[in-house]
């Protein structure tokens, strides 16, 4: 089982516990392949699905908020990142049939005829009921694939961490970026296995080459799959 690392560069710019227990199977899916994801390209449609353990449908609404690189609510106006309007009622739902537990399945799309996201960055979708009470929220990221960075994964040099950590070296192409600026404009965020809670935020690169930035010594903890196995002394292997 391998580990996936995802790079993102940012240009700096009521109590409802009772009903939450009834909400199950919340997922953000890419609308093309129905794969659960948290990171989407700017031209992809996102399908949000969830179930409520109930035999009667209710009115739910959703809204979208934009956040900065540090997941703090953006100071930009909604019209700057959203074309259209949100706080839209979810009208696509159906009832379960012949199930031991009755439920209502709801779904809606982000990037639809009423709502288009105009900016890349961090977002949160929030679903509320008719009274405006919070039902659930999910974070996701919209990206524009304008850079092709590379990642090198290697063992830690410190022997105390070789069996528990791994080191990453990231190279980001950037021909026209100013490394010597007092206020460096870019930040690198590396996510492990698409987990928004397991990431590294790097404010400045370690050094700059002629046409790229290099971020060195980015460390992550790893599981047993990263233990080194030396087979250099194995002379032959019999496979039956």
Question: Which role fits each region the language model picked out?
Answer:
Residues 62-64, 121-128, 220-240:
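Short, aromatic- and glycine-rich surface loops/edge beta-strands on solvent-exposed regions
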Residues 56-84, 178-203:
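Extended low-complexity, serine/threonine- and proline-enriched intrinsically disordered segments
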Residues 23-66, 161-174:
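Contiguous beta-strand segments within globular domains
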Residues 100-128:
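Ligand-binding face of N-terminal immunoglobulin V-set domains in extracellular IgSF glycoproteins
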Residues 1-21:
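Bacterial Sec-dependent N-terminal signal peptides
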Residues 89-90, 97-111, 208-236:
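Aromatic sugar-binding surface patches on proteins
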Residues 142-165:
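Low-complexity, Pro/Ser/Thr- and charge-rich linker/hinge segments at domain boundaries
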Residues 65, 118-131, 187-193:
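Internal, hydrophobic beta-strand segments that form the core of beta-sheet-rich folds
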């Amino acid at each position: 089982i391998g580990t996936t690392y995802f790079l993102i560069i940012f240009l700096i710019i009521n109590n409802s516990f009772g009903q939450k227990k009834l909400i199950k199977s919340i997922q953000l899916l890419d609308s093309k392949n129905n794969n659960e994801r948290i990171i989407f390209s700017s031209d992809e449609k996102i399908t949000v699905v969830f179930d409520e353990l109930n035999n009667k449908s209710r009115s739910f609404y959703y809204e979208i908020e934009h956040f900065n690189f540090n997941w703090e609510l953006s100071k930009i106006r909604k019209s700057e990142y959203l074309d259209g309007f949100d706080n839209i009622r979810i009208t696509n739902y159906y009832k379960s049939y012949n199930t031991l537990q009755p439920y209502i399945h709801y779904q809606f799309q982000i990037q639809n005829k009423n709502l288009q996201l105009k900016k890349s960055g961090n977002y949160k979708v929030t679903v509320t009921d008719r009274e405006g009470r919070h039902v659930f929220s999910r974070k996701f990221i919209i990206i524009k694939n304008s850079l092709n960075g590379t990642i090198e994964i290697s063992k830690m040099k410190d022997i105390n961490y070789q069996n528990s950590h791994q080191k990453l070296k990231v190279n980001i192409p950037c021909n026209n970026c100013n490394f010597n600026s007092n206020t460096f404009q870019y930040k690198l965020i590396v996510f492990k296995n698409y987990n928004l809670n397991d990431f590294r935020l790097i404010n400045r690169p370690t050094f700059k080459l002629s046409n790229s930035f290099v971020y060195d010594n980015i460390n992550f903890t790893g599981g047993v799959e990263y233990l080194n196995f030396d087979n250099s002394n194995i002379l032959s292997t019999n496979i039956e």
